[in-house]
């Protein structure tokens, strides 16, 4: 027995695998609980803008409303349309949800707090977000209904249009940080920047990329809204036009999985914005008592700030027409992001401040 625990199979493969599985389960539990309260916050913010109370019955201040909704969905009977392709119909919400959760494998919430701290973490998330379109297309096609099919076509065009802009945003951050490793991007915002140039390295907030790359931050924010089908770009599930879009034939647990995948994707975009532009887990001022606060708390606060911006867009901005959505993506954001890539590369080169 002692020989087994000393073997290379145990130390080099089995034990690291057990640790990774335990980390994955812990992350999944924490993430799902966080999603429950992010969904509640979304409803509360929307209610506050409309001057009403919002969910306030289940638990104190409605804190357990999301768990009651979970129970309601799980206990309902799933209904599959007679003409639907049953296998693809049931697989679509699983694909959507699993892909959204997979992106969190590479997101660090603190220094060293990532299941897989890979050197191409940004590209991994970008690839996962690109694949998420398949869940929507599968749902739209397999439902054998015109409304889901139209929503799937809209979604394909919408996601392709705004992934291009997000790709150029990633390139500008790559130019500034010199790496695609998410932890290294955060550390780059601590080590160098405006605060170092003016001789105040404690003001780490001045090193965050949101200041020199503010136009790209705006492009990323709006593109994230479009990428995750959030208002004012919720053309895929427009209630007044397509009833509920690609989810119109879904109910019970499959519908819940789609909703879960949507909110996990929104949270992923908020986390990515936090890492790329807001310094990740870094405190705004690197002095006591700010640096006494654990980095994961700063990360959570910044993530919720980004989600608040997304929730406010849902509450106050009217829905775009589809032609306006396409025009914004191809005629405004694409040229702007291309110009910004050239400008950032030029400034870094001629100022001699490009990362080595």
UniProtKB/Swiss-Prot annotation:
It is found in: Cell inner membrane. GO terms for cellular component: plasma membrane. It catalyses: a quinone + NADH + 5 H(+)(in) = a quinol + NAD(+) + 4 H(+)(out). The keyword Cell membrane applies. It comes from the Bacteria. PROSITE patterns: COMPLEX1_ND1_2. It is a multi-pass membrane protein. The keyword Ribosomal protein does not apply. The chain crosses the membrane at residues 18-38, 87-107, 120-140, 166-186, 205-225, 265-285, 292-312, 333-353. GO terms for biological process: aerobic respiration. Keywords: Cell inner membrane, Cell membrane, Membrane, NAD, Quinone, Translocase, Transmembrane, Transmembrane helix, Ubiquinone. GO terms for molecular function: NADH dehydrogenase activity; oxidoreductase activity, acting on NAD(P)H, quinone or similar compound as acceptor; quinone binding. Its EC number is 7.1.1.-. Belongs to the complex I subunit 1 family. NDH-1 shuttles electrons from NADH, via FMN and iron-sulfur (Fe-S) centers, to quinones in the respiratory chain. The immediate electron acceptor for the enzyme in this species is believed to be ubiquinone. Couples the redox reaction to proton translocation (for every two electrons transferred, four hydrogen ions are translocated across the cytoplasmic membrane), and thus conserves the redox energy in a proton gradient. This subunit may bind ubiquinone. NCBIfam families: PRK06076.1-6 (NF004745). NDH-1 is composed of 14 different subunits. Subunits NuoA, H, J, K, L, M, N constitute the membrane sector of the complex. This is NADH-quinone oxidoreductase subunit H. It comes from Bradyrhizobium sp. (strain ORS 278).
